Amino acid sequence: MNPTNLSKYPNKLIVSKIRNGIVIDHIPAGKALKVLRVLGITGSEGLRVALVMNVESRKLGRKDIVKIEEKFLSMKELSLIALIAPTATINVIKEYKVVEKQRVEPPSIVKGLIKCPNPTCISRKKNEPIKSLFKLKSTNPIMLECQYCGYVLKGDEIEDYIES
């Protein structure tokens, strides 16, 4: 598609391809900025990022998409994405081609990534060397249970307690 002829494609989404990096697709609508937040991407890193929000999706009705050039994800980052956008798909791009495609899966155990909201939980005590420990209780909706105090974190509440 030639950008000068955009009027010929009124219903097309035009975002340039990336040479190397990732495309995070099938993010629930409105969650792309939260995905960038958990990845620690603010815009000042110098990474080229394309963000598309609330586009039509046969699977989800509406979805968000994030493209990040020259970025690849760690297991920790994949786990965090799975907790806030469990329908997401990660496409790894090398030399403009998709070389790997995977759906994210919430981890069954989440250790040290999320702070327990319960202020009396032992994992919140400053002089305790233990890290928070949550067990996946449900995937739809996502629910995590603290293994120390029993507090249950649900859905959108999770992103508020992600450790930075």
Curated annotation (Swiss-Prot):
**PANTHER family, sorted:** ASPARTATE CARBAMOYLTRANSFERASE REGULATORY CHAIN
**Assembly mode:** Contains catalytic and regulatory chains.
Output the Gene3D superfamilies linked to this UniProt entry: Aspartate carbamoyltransferase regulatory subunit, C-terminal domain (2.30.30.20), Aspartate carbamoyltransferase regulatory subunit, N-terminal domain (3.30.70.140)
Task: Please name the GO terms that the record assigns under molecular function.
Answer: metal ion binding
Cofactor notes: Binds 1 zinc ion per subunit.
Q: Is Zinc one of the keywords?
A: yes
The cofactors named for this UniProt entry are: Zn(2+)
UniProt GO BP:
'de novo' pyrimidine nucleobase biosynthetic process; pyrimidine nucleotide biosynthetic process
Name of this protein: Aspartate carbamoyltransferase regulatory chain
- Residue numbers binding Zn(2+): 116, 121, 146, 149
Show the GO cellular component annotation of the record. Answer: aspartate carbamoyltransferase complex
